[in-house]
Curated annotation (Swiss-Prot):
Belongs to the universal ribosomal protein uS19 family. Keywords: Ribonucleoprotein, Ribosomal protein, RNA-binding, rRNA-binding. It comes from the Bacteria. This is Small ribosomal subunit protein uS19. GO terms for cellular component: cytoplasm; small ribosomal subunit. Pfam families: Ribosomal_S19. PANTHER family: RIBOSOMAL PROTEIN S19P FAMILY MEMBER, SMALL RIBOSOMAL SUBUNIT PROTEIN US19M. GO terms for biological process: ribosomal small subunit assembly; translation. One of its GO terms (molecular function) is structural constituent of ribosome. The gene is rpsS. It comes from Dictyoglomus turgidum (strain DSM 6724 / Z-1310).
């Protein structure tokens, strides 16, 4: 189930405060955050937010197409290295 419409989208209060301060000053700095669950709102457009993926912060530039999605969607947490090839097949190929 999604979040109730009467509550509105969840945005981490500290992150929203930082965004509003930068908008007032007219600055564009990279903002580090651990809040992957925060929803992208129109105030964030044009900013770069470094989202933590469990190992490092991934810089995400916010565009209009991202509004309504969550920050965590743009910072993958798992690295896929591919499936293992059986050793018998490797020797047959050579």
């Amino acid at each position: 189930m999604g979040r109730s419409l009467k509550k509105g989208p969840y945005v981490d209060p500290k992150l929203l405060k930082k965004i509003r301060e930068l908008n007032e000053k007219g600055e564009k700095k990279i903002i580090k955050t651990w809040s992957r669950r925060s929803v992208i709102v129109p105030e964030m457009v044009g900013h770069t937010i470094a989202v933590y993926n469990g190992r490092k912060h991934i810089p995400v530039y916010i565009t209009e197409n991202m509004i309504g999605h969550r920050l965590g969607e743009f910072a993958p947490t798992r690295t896929f290295t591919g499936h293992r090839i059986p050793t018998a097949r490797i020797t047959a190929i050579k």
